[in-house]
Amino acid sequence: MSPARTTLGVLLLVLAPAAALAADWADTLERVAPSVVAIQVDAARAFDTEWNVSTQATGFVVDAERGLILTNRHVVTPGPVTARAIFQNREEVVLQAVYRDPVHDFGFYRYDPASLRFAAPRALRLHPAGARVGTDIRVLGNDAGEQLSILAGTLARIDREAPDYGPGKYNDFNTFYLQAASSTSGGSSGSPVIDVTGKVVGLNAGGSTGAASSFYLPLARVARALALLQSGQAVTRGTLQVVFRYTPYDQLRRLGLTAETERRHRKLFPARTGMLVVAEVQPGSEAAGQLEVGDILTALDGSPVAEFDALAAQLDDSVGSRVSVEVERGGLARRVDLRVVDLETLSPASLLELGDTVLHDLSWQMARHLNLPVRGVYVANPGFLLTQAGVPRGAVIEELEGRPVAALGDLVEALAAVPQDQLVQVRYVRPEEPLNPRVSAVRMDRRWFPARTCRRDDAAGRWPCRDLPEPPVAEPGQAGQAASTRFDANGDPVLDALAPSLVQVRFDMPYSVLGITERNYRGTGVVVDAGRGLVLVDRNTVPTSLGVARLTFASTLELPARVAWIHPLHNLALLTYDPQALGDTPVRSVRLGEAGLRPADEAWAVGFKGDGRLVGQLTRVASLDPVDFPVSRTLAFREANLETLRLVNGPTDFDGVLADASGAVQAIWATFAYQDGRRTAQVGQGIAVEDVRSLIEAYDRDGIVQSLEVEWQPVSLAAARRMGLDDAWTRRISEHSPTRRSLLMAERVVAGSPAVGVVEPGDLLLAIDGRVVNTFREAEAATVAGLRQLLVWRAGAEVTLSVEPVGWSGSDLDRVLVWSGATLHDPHRAMSAQRGIEASGVFVAYFMFGSPASRFRLLAGRRITEVDGRPVTDLDDFMAEVADRPDGSSLRLKLVDWNGTPELITLTLDEHHWPAYLLERGTDGWARRRP
């Protein structure tokens, strides 16, 4: 044979098996793929190690007759969940969670096979013994959200330690993991790891962010659980509350393993190169004090043990029984008898929702991270109620009002006796300091959110809930009561003069509305009328009427307050409180100055710091300048048409007042919130006393503020002349205001207002009703109800315009609808003022993660303008369109974003986890009801 023919023959011999293998893989993948599904997961509540979230993953059919789908535990989730599976032919089925392992990263969903009309998936066979080093594998899954991706690899390890995802997160233990370099990523969780025959040899569970390594769960315990579910039996899981770690022999010898024990185990388990060693003993367990870290496990009930599957097999079949545990410690053999605990009793299966807070029993998963006994109530989500008290996520509640809280039932029973607005003392530990308990005062508040308990029902695949009974009525003197106090002398005459007129203000929002992203605020309030209990604040302290306001007097007495008035145009608001509740506390109205402040004037900045101390700082006025903040990305309130005082090295750590040496207030030292790109910031500036007086006058008059609905910006006379302003008007403006040679130029017109199509950007304002105006204050003073005549300079000539002002009340928000996890209300002025958006439709202010709004992208900042093709102009229209829709039904929503781009989405209702309710503001405050 010639050399060429020889080479070709060798090449064919090499390529032929490769081609055959490729063909085998192609056939296998074609056969397996129809049984792999993409799973859309909506974890409706934060629970245990998981947050509420909308995400995606993978699963695969393991029993086509029963509709069982295998995936990861963290995909089934330990808490309330809704999920759907999408087959490769794009058929969609509803899933019900039927099992999640207490420790290992696997679980099962169930679907109704009869609901499939076109797909005919076959069950994939689990083959635990097929996981061997060197096995070529393929991972089929929804990798990176691509519905179906196929990733190749070769099993490199079958005895890898379980991956560690960090403290406070879900972590598997007491099992080996498989490892290969297949570069799986988000969305591929729950993917089948198959061999060339199509058998499943592992379950994809996680991967390394810094390498191509992927980690797969072995299937021995999975196969057992599946068999029990198929036979209708409970999946028993036992534990000693001990975490073992597989340790090689070289390290075991240093721990004191005897030569005889090593010889015996090497002979019994020739494939193993190590044994199991105690790595953690859970405090409070029976094993605590009997087993120690470093103990080498040699036998269980007399049977030698060297790996996790054998250990689990014995424990899972011995729940409730006692077993003999044999270990070696420092070369000495020891034996202890321990009861096998049911793992399900260490996994929470019920929750309490109260004030947006989610609470449940502490799990072994989280107790491990804290090194605490599995006892107490875990804060899965601090929500509105506990955030106000400073209790964080991950905290464990141990006592309530001095009563021990061992389990959720204890807490539910204790809270049932707490009236609305009453304070209770909660003792808890934080995850970063589990050995250092803390105590916080929590104020009971059930007006904003549903209050209910929910318990998992695996047979139904749901979490049925029961509303808590109404709280008892507070007895006189229990809630919201105050006594009298006095104001101590500070030793500073200015602070002493102002102390009786300044209060600490705390404001907490239960929902994000009006484009406001932060929910908890602290600041300084000014008592402007002690007889009526009237307190002035800035809108960066009280940004809306939807929330809870409380005032603290003399750092001693705390009173509830009500939002009385929100200035519709400027950064000011008014609160009211009951003066009678202060007894004879010598609170007095602040003394407002007459002269105001000018550049170079000295002033005392006085206010409360974050720690409650009243402080003062002598400063000087640097300038009086117009505000010029960027438009809000979230469509929140933004100050405009106002000149503010800027200080030389003004305070940045408190707000309050600017006063003269006698204690007369000449300005409010306010903080202004603004958004610069994606960054939210705030800056301190002074609001002149003249503007404060006009606010109080408007409130006392009828509470209505008239607005031309035009945003003005000062321009110099030189700039105006470049725009064609003639000499006559230049002289007239100079004579009208010799020290302020400028005009107001129209920059924006509020969409939907009478000024649209009349006033145009670039118009120079000359006069209103014949009176020359060139400042914001003059323009506002001239804007009264009724048709106004504006004289403007446009395109080189005078133009007379007729504009009807718009009257705005101080009620910024009266209704909020919580629907499908979205917070909805009528469009607000900031949208129209900043972005030129017509105030029609329904504004999406916020959406909750894990909700239908999150899943179907009903995103914040959009407006809903149609429901199923029918127009909606306001919240009433929307509520009428969605009323009486059955749970699980779908509807079409037309959305419009901030720049007018339309979008059509579909949304499926989930009334069980996300019931609709309406928040309404009445004479007695806000109340919640079904719409």
Which role does the model predict for each range below?
Residues 44-45, 76-77, 144-146, 542-543, ...:
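Short glycine/acidic-enriched loop and turn motifs that connect beta-strands
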Residues 20-23:
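Boundary at the C-terminal end of the N-terminal hydrophobic targeting segment
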Residues 35, 41, 52, 112-124, ...:
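Active-site region of chymotrypsin-like
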Residues 27, 65, 73, 96-97, ...:
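C-terminal recognition in membrane/secretory proteostasis and scaffolding
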Residues 48-51, 146, 314, 514-517:
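Short consensus segments that form the blades of beta-propeller domains
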Residues 31-45, 139, 497-512, 603-605:
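A short, Trp-centered hydrophobic/proline-enriched beta-strand micro-motif
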Residues 68, 91, 125-156, 552, ...:
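Short glycine/Trp-rich loop-beta-loop segment that forms part of the substrate-binding cleft
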Residues 7-18:
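Bacterial N-terminal signal peptides
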